[in-house]
UniProtKB/Swiss-Prot annotation:
Name of the protein in question: UDP-glucuronosyltransferase 2B10
Topological category with respect to the lipid bilayer: Single-pass membrane protein
Residues listed as glycosylation sites in the UniProt record: N66, N314, N481
Gene name, Swiss-Prot/TrEMBL: UGT2B10
Assigned keywords, A-Z: Endoplasmic reticulum, Glycoprotein, Glycosyltransferase, Membrane, Microsome, Signal, Transferase, Transmembrane, Transmembrane helix
Catalytic activity of the protein: glucuronate acceptor + UDP-alpha-D-glucuronate = acceptor beta-D-glucuronoside + UDP + H(+)
GO (cellular component) term, any one: endoplasmic reticulum membrane
Signal peptide: 1-23
CDD domains per UniProt: GT1_Gtf-like (cd03784)
Length: 528
């Protein structure tokens, strides 16, 4: 009997302590690959007993209001329908994929217009939330402990400011590292850290460093200034005081960067930054029966996995046939994620799928190569499982991601718009038959696995840490409180130069005075 009551008491105590450590997390939702990373973290938070509420628009592409998942959805109405929103995104993606990238400035200016269009949509979503008094009252009364958001899609920091609670960012990159540098205080010396979207490596020639500096200036004085004006005005109106987006973002307690040093080029970082790249990666699960049979039928030659991501749903008939012709000439079997009309040149060794279990395929022992658009999620999965890549980058950070892998000897790049079947065929033969590519990717894989704490556990730790301590201001550097000229010590340099100039002026005056005195005395002596 005593044992029975002891057991009951222990169970009650466990519930007491568990509930005491649980927190309430408000999430400003993202879409596509951004959401896939966030969802991995959120599900782990739920597993640990936290209450997670995801703020999603009625036009959201990835959320189903009727989904009975462990994540609580708070759907807010917006003027766009789901179909309209998806069509807009697909049109923007189509425009991005058609941008000619062989000129110096044109790709940036065209991508900038598209990014501004996306920003306008996100800002309207944000307005729909903060102007919804009933929803805001409900959220206020819920007494959340923290806001979790992606820095690429502003609004989460505004909600945190309105509710007076700390917030944590999940982030990959912003064009030109604008948010990271101006809002996060990140340090990216242009002498050896290439600007994102520049396609440069950290081993730059003099002219490449000149090019990199021009990119920095472009993003600082054009993209940053003109893109932020609307956000600054909107935040000032909502908060009832003059402010800026950057000023609000600077209050972030922790930045969880979805990068790692085996992928990105090294650079300095701050105390409130942790790198959790590859947090979504996991061991491969068994494949569906039909797919496993097809993979096993490849024999010793193995298989090639081909995917251009979730945002590219179709391609021209001409490009599809160029690719199909190349794939038909390799001895490997090919699993191609493709949502379009079957190419006429499709070989017997290639099967088309509207969806593939990419992580599980990359982790299969028969996989020999991965043809990818260069999305960060896919690259991390390839690194995790040690699969060399052929990169066909399309837009945004994808050319940079492939440039990183190429610099590390783990990938070959081909251009989607100009490649021939021979180009793709030769690239595949290189990464499959040249053992150096497998060796290099396996080295990166070993580094990815050799971490004292898994990236996902670190990400969850920092969110829980901020909830426990009501923030992490002790990790926030004082640089956030300085103006740009104070940060670069221009006021100090100016003061010291003024001091030197004053001393030189006094010395010069003294010398002139002495010279005048001696000259006068000499003239007087001559007259005597």
């Amino acid at each position: 009997m005593a044992l029975k009551w002891t057991t009951v008491l222990l169970i009650q105590l466990s519930f007491y302590f568990s509930s005491g450590s649980c927190g309430k997390v408000l999430v400003w939702a993202a879409e596509y690959s951004l959401w896939m990373n966030m969802k991995t973290i959120l599900k782990e938070l739920v597993q640990r007993g936290h209450e997670v509420t995801v703020l999603a628009s009625s036009a959201s592409i990835l959320f189903d209001p009727n989904d009975s998942s462990t994540l609580k959805l708070e759907v807010y109405p917006t003027s766009l329908t789901k179909t309209e929103f998806e069509n807009i995104i697909m049109q923007l993606v189509k425009r991005l994929s058609e941008i000619q990238k062989d000129t110096f400035w044109l790709p940036f200016s065209q991508e900038q217009e598209i990014l501004w269009a996306i920003n306008d949509i996100i800002r309207n979503f944000c307005k729909d939330v903060v102007s919804n008094k009933k929803l805001m009252k409900k959220l206020q009364e819920s007494r959340f402990d923290i806001v979790f958001a992606d820095a690429y899609l502003p609004c989460g920091e505004l909600l945190a400011e309105l509710f007076n609670i700390p917030f944590v960012y999940s982030h990959s990159f912003s064009p030109g590292y604008s948010f990271e540098r101006h809002s996060g205080g990140f340090i990216f010396p242009p002498s050896y850290v290439p600007v994102v979207m520049s396609k440069l490596s950290d081993q730059m020639t003099f002219m490449e460093r000149v090019k990199n500096m021009l990119y920095v200036l472009y993003f600082d004085f054009w993209f940053q200034i003109f893109n932020m004006k609307k956000w600054d005005q909107f935040y000032s109106e909502v908060l009832g005081r003059p402010t800026t987006l950057s000023e609000t973002m600077r209050k972030a307690d922790i930045w969880l960067m979805r990068n790692s040093w085996n992928f990105k080029f090294p650079h300095p970082f701050l105390p409130n930054v942790d790198f959790v790249g590859g947090l979504h990666c996991k061991p491969a699960k068994p494949l569906p029966k039909e797919m496993e049979e097809f993979v096993q039928s490849s024999g010793e030659n193995g298989v090639v996995v081909f995917s251009l991501g979730s945002m590219v749903s179709n391609m021209t008939e001409e490009r599809a046939n160029v690719i199909a012709t190349a794939l038909a000439k390799i001895p490997q079997k090919v699993l191609w994620r493709f949502d379009g009309n079957k190419p006429d040149a499709l070989g017997l060794n290639t099967r088309l799928y509207k969806w593939i279990p990419q992580n599980d395929l990359l982790g299969h022992p028969k996989t020999r190569a991965f043809i990818t658009h260069g999305g960060a999620n896919g690259i991390y999965e390839a690194i995790y499982h040690g699969i060399p890549m052929v990169g066909i980058p399309l837009f945004f950070d994808q050319p940079d991601n492939i440039a990183h892998m190429k610099a590390k000897g783990a990938a070959v790049r081909v251009d989607f718009n100009t490649m021939s079947s021979t180009d793709l065929l030769n690239a595949l033969k290189t990464v499959i038959n040249d053992p150096s590519y497998k060796e290099n990717i396996m080295k990166l894989s070993r580094i990815q696995h050799d971490q004292p704490v898994k990236p996902l556990d670190r990400a969850v730790f920092w969110i829980e840490f901020v909830m426990r301590h009501k923030g992490a201001k002790h990790l926030r550097v004082a640089a956030h409180n300085l103006t740009w000229f104070q940060y670069h010590s221009l006021d100090v340099i100016g003061f010291l130069l003024a001091c030197v100039a004053t001393v030189l002026f006094i010395i010069t005056k003294c010398c002139l005075f002495c010279f005048w005195k001696f000259a006068r005395k000499g003239k007087k002596g001559k007259r005597d």
